[in-house]
Amino acid sequence: MSPTAAPQKLSKVEDLKARSQYLLEPILSQLQEESTHFNEDGIQILKFHGSYQQDNRDNRVKGQEKDFQFMLRLRSPGGYIPPQLYLTLDQLADDYGNGTLRATTRQAFQLHGILKRDLKTVIRRIVENLGSTISACGDVNRNVMAPPAPFRDRPEYEWARTYANNIADLLTPESGAYYELWLDGEKVLSGEPDPAVLAARRNPKGRVADSVEPLYSDRYLPRKFKIAVTVPGDNSIDLFTQDIGLVVIGNDRGELEGFNVYVGGGMGRTHNKEETFARLADPLGFVPAADIYAAVQAIVATQRDYGDRSNRRHARMKYLIHDWGIAKFKEAVESVFGKAIAPVRELPPFRYRDYLGWHEQGDGKWFLGLPITSGRIKDDGNWQLRSALREIVSRWQLPLLLTGSQDVLIYDVQPGDRAAIDKLLRDRGVHTVEAIDSLQRYAMACPALPTCGLAITESERALPGLLVRIRRLLEEQGLPDEHFVVRMTGCPNGCARPYMAELAFVGSAPNTYQLWLGGSPDQTRLARPFIDRLADGDVETQLRPLFVFFKQSRQAGESFGDFCDRVGFDALRQFSESYQHEAAKPRYRVGLRADVHGRLKAEADKRGVSLTDLACEAIAAYLR
């Protein structure tokens, strides 16, 4: 028997959604106004169309209007970006944006710096060139993730990409408001949905009869909703942070049998609100491939009907599952689904993959994974990343795949073109994975200041300098090649998934962060807060004893996050509190003539001592 939804006092946003005429107003009216920005109601509805209103805090002047601008986020299931779309986005960044593109942690692109008067033009150009911003934000299903690796000889990767795309189509809002607002009612489509998706939309289970939005209803979902599809063992998409995580499972004949389903993950939390927290997804069960669309709709419908619509801080599906327990949630889903859900199948351990460097696709072609610091694609001095990507995509007409770690894969590369692409990247000063610090490889940051309205402090702009400081500390301890997962955010909302990191900095005040420790290198375990308020100037003081303890007490091959989790926070605090840092002793340099150096070295070799020790002994004897 399914539970009964208790009456709720709805939040203001819930009432606004119901009055929006299925996401049309007040955007339609306010687009016709001469103002540079939308009001609060407009801001909320605009999110469903893939845009956030922002202002550049670096440009604020007392007594003057804020520097209003807009971020546009694309929907690109599995991170797929065709050449035509990429070149369009690159041009739009110059014509209407701030001259950069940003790859997100959910395999999509963002354009920043768009003015209100240009929104319609930019969105239309995106849609006309095989892209879309619909449902990239808002209380709906967001961009669906999948492993970015374009393997052609491993069917499980093809299944993951196909189902990610189809589920994105299945859960796209059906209201025509998007096309009415941005394309004057013209429904521009890049292709019809898969027939199985169309059939699933006709399934009445979990859908609202006679509604413009039969799955979402007029209030849409209580909060954002995130889905990823992956293959056994591949955690390139942070499976356990999703509202729904699907794992494709095949048989020995190379056929897709079904999916393990995980539910209830989520990162967002609020400082000093203990009722908000990051959470890992729970296993729900195994669903045959023929039933997966119905199962996904049943899960979404359960969250639609029972998720908290009175308190947006408590509205994600993770809180519903936490409050109910997975057994009760499963029962509610089964009542909509109409079938019992079998236990999950056994899987191999999940490992993090980033697919950087050159890889064979399995069809004679290659793909190249390029590291992108915080996902920001720009030209900066001798580092001409944006120019290099533009030239590669334009010259060879190559598609891209974005990763969940804000990097870019260039794929379908002919073997004979590899050398030319490598040379082009070198000429443009673009570093491949072999040339970057391994800390940078495994680090992520959200944009934060100056444009994100939720940012408390710096993140993207602070991360490069922070990584340099961490590397110096590691070198100080004789760990010059050590690396681990570092993530940084300007607020606690978790956009860069910091609560899965081995070491995370979560903005809590200007130039101040919460320090989180103990996540796993494969992002399968939550980190925990270690220091509540860490001032930027105290980073070395607080991290140094942790790295000293790590160097002294780690097990063979043990990562920093695993070490912190194994020894426990009490031991970490005890060591840190008792640690006395000895400043490095001064080292003096003395020059020697070449003939004297040669004689000293020969004598040192003869005695079996170091050159330094022998030189000190000789000088001391002379001074006596």
Curated annotation (Swiss-Prot):
Binds 1 siroheme per subunit. It is an enzyme of class 1 (oxidoreductase). Keywords: 4Fe-4S, Heme, Iron, Iron-sulfur, Metal-binding, Oxidoreductase, Thioether bond. Coiled coil: none annotated. There is a cross-link at Y52-C137 (3'-(S-cysteinyl)-tyrosine (Tyr-Cys)). It catalyses: hydrogen sulfide + 6 oxidized [2Fe-2S]-[ferredoxin] + 3 H2O = sulfite + 6 reduced [2Fe-2S]-[ferredoxin] + 7 H(+). It holds the Pfam family NIR_SIR. Siroheme binds at C495. One of its GO terms (molecular function) is sulfite reductase (ferredoxin) activity. One of its GO terms (cellular component) is sulfite reductase complex (NADPH). [4Fe-4S] cluster binds at C446, C452, C491, C495. Its cofactor is siroheme; [4Fe-4S] cluster. InterPro entries: NiRdtase/SiRdtase_haem-b_fer, Nit/Sulf_reduc_fer-like_dom_sf, NO2/SO3_Rdtase_4Fe4S_dom, NO2/SO3_Rdtase_4Fe4S_prot, NO2/SO3_Rdtase_4Fe4S_sf, NO2/SO3_Rdtase_FeS/sirohaem_BS, SiR_ferredoxin-dep. Transmembrane segments: none annotated. Catalyzes the reduction of sulfite to sulfide, a step in the biosynthesis of sulfur-containing amino acids and cofactors. Monomer. This is Sulfite reductase [ferredoxin]. It comes from Synechococcus elongatus (strain ATCC 33912 / PCC 7942 / FACHB-805).
